[in-house]
Amino acid sequence: MKNLKKIIRIALENDWIKKDPFAYYRFKLEETDPEFLTMDEIKIILAKEFTIKRVEQVRDIFVFCIFTGLAFSDVKDLSPEHLVKDNKGELWIRKNRQKTKIMCNIPVLPVAASILDKYKDVVECTGKLLPVLCNQRMNSYLKEIADVCGIHKNLSTHTARHSYATSICLANGVSMENVAKMLGHADTSVTKHYARVLDQNIFKDMQKVNSCLSELAI
């Protein structure tokens, strides 16, 4: 829809059309729930051993995205200059998002730090922190990883980012405001959507508990 509006605007500016054909229409986009991994699914991927080096690397990059919330373009662009230590010696990722140019400030959790350490001397990482493939190849390997791990979800770097927001942050009590800052969101409107999805999943789980306990009474 955004691309269509852009084309209409360019056509109007160049007098290719006389008026906006959609001027009196208001489109309401239907919200879709972002897919994310549960903590149990994340642990399965972490524990899985891969014999093929390239698949292992893709798993590591995917896990790094889960524990930092970085989008594909940002993790591919990640270089030593984006790593900063604060006055307490804690490691942070500080960089502008490729998509929005908004600064994101992300504390480097132990899992992410161990992945950075694992690839610090890898030749493929010259000038960059991690050996990131092109998006198409990475998503192809992620399908293979999902199959091997028995996870029936469409794994992508988007899934990793959603998992960071929900399972890593919001589920562990991180405020929406802080999640928004770490993800590089302009405000909390998108973050609130993650929180709503998380609430829905909690409710579904509690319904299962309720059905198991339904026969109990005092």
Give short role names for the model-derived ranges:
Residues 122, 209-218:
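C-terminal secondary-structure termini that scaffold catalytic or DNA-interacting sites
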Residues 57-58, 132-136, 152-172:
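Short basic/aromatic active-site micro-motif
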Residues 82-89, 152-153, 173-193, 200, ...:
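Short, polar N-cap/turn motifs at the start of nucleic acid-interacting alpha helices
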Residues 31, 98-117, 123-144:
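C-terminal catalytic core of Y-nucleophile DNA break-rejoin enzymes
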